[in-house]
Amino acid sequence: MNGYEAYMKELAQQMRAELTDNGFTSLETSDDVNQYMQNIDNDDTTFVVINSTCGCAAGLARPAAVAVAEQNEVKPDHKVTVFAGQDKEATQTMRDYIQQVPSSPSYALFKGQHLVHFIPREHIEGRDINDIAMDLKDAFDDNCQ
């Protein structure tokens, strides 16, 4: 591993911890993603954060995801994350389940293996964090019972 890769791995670990320290399960391999998705109960909801090292992930996506997942009255059954640019195979496998244009950071909400809501980067970047949180709240309220 060269110096740049080592630096990015260390930096990404802190960014990953912002989610895992708040109850998100990190899926770091393609097998992790497939095992999770293939074994999820059809009635369970899963909130997926596709994490990223960019500024909008740090200042908007991760804080909004954590706040709403912890504070909203209606919560998904499960919270998972993959890290774009770091866990490339895991991210691609999750994107195969999502079946939307690749976007990071982004959010996906599943019921079983069925995608019920998706928020791409362009609906995160440049927006007020409270607006993003309200989008997540509405998605949880509509789909997580």
From Swiss-Prot:
Pfam families referenced in this protein's UniProt entry, alphabetically: Disulph_isomer
Domain of life: Bacteria
InterPro entries per UniProt: BrxB/BrxA
GO biological processes: cell redox homeostasis
Family: Belongs to the bacilliredoxin family.
NCBIfam families: YphP_YqiW
Full protein name: Bacilliredoxin SERP1006
